[in-house]
Amino acid sequence: MSVLIIAGLDSSTGAGLARDLAVMAELGLPARIAATAVTAQDSAGGCLLHPVPAAMVAAQIHAAGPVRAAKLGMLADAEIVAAVADSLPPVPTVLDPVLATSAGVGLIDAAGLAAMIALLFPRATLITPNLPEAALLTGLPEATAPDRLAAALFARGARAVLLKGGHGKGAEAVDWLCRPDAPALRLASPRKPGTKRGTGCTLASAIAGHLALGADLPTACARAKAHLDGWL
């Protein structure tokens, strides 16, 4: 029943592997990890990033043994992306396309981003971009309608997209689960005041956890949204 978490280590423990592991503990699921990078992050938004060698990332994935689902977070560069693509087991996989810290510090280079789209979008069961990430991935404005953003991501190889609305406006935080062969599913919760790090990690890990528990994709997304709302 283990879930494989492939992500970076955030020294502040506010996001990344620490947050992913906390979610697995909350769900009562064992986890296996593959660290892609070590970061030094502080409360002022500073971030130093040291990628783990791609061969070591692959070795960690192979050492994990059998798992029921996987969650991918920060991947740092093209060599790591390629190692993950070559080593990833054939299980339901949630890709959180982490592009930058909450303070705007980049966490993947241009070659890594291109490799992520080419190698991992077609492999992932679901990708979970927020609105700024969806805009960067598609070249469209953040205000573009969800169905158009999703269509542009499908054209780049994505199989299913959860567009996260936490960066939007209004009384509700609205996420849209979009699939090429089904109507879009609206998932809404009351918008909480302020900001909190680790929301994307929490949601993606919770989805992966519920997929490991046997839920279908819409159910896993709905349960994960409720889990995130409870944490906030």
Please name every model-derived segment.
Residues 1-5, 17-102:
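Conserved N-terminal subdomain of the carbohydrate kinase-like
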Residues 6-12, 184-198:
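Short pre-catalytic strand/loop immediately N-terminal to key active-site residues, enriched for Gly-Thr
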Residues 23, 135-136, 194-217, 221:
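Short, small-residue alpha-helix embedded
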Residues 28-32, 183-185, 210-225:
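Phosphate-handling active-site elements
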Residues 45-52, 105-110, 139-142, 192:
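Short glycine-enriched, charge-decorated loop/helix-capping segments at active-site entrances
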Residues 79-92, 159, 180-184, 194, ...:
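Nucleotide and nucleotide-moiety/phosphate-recognizing core
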Residues 108-184:
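Conserved phosphate/ATP/ADP-binding segment of small-molecule kinases
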Residues 146-154, 216-231:
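Short, well-structured alpha-helical segments that form the helix of a local strand-helix-strand
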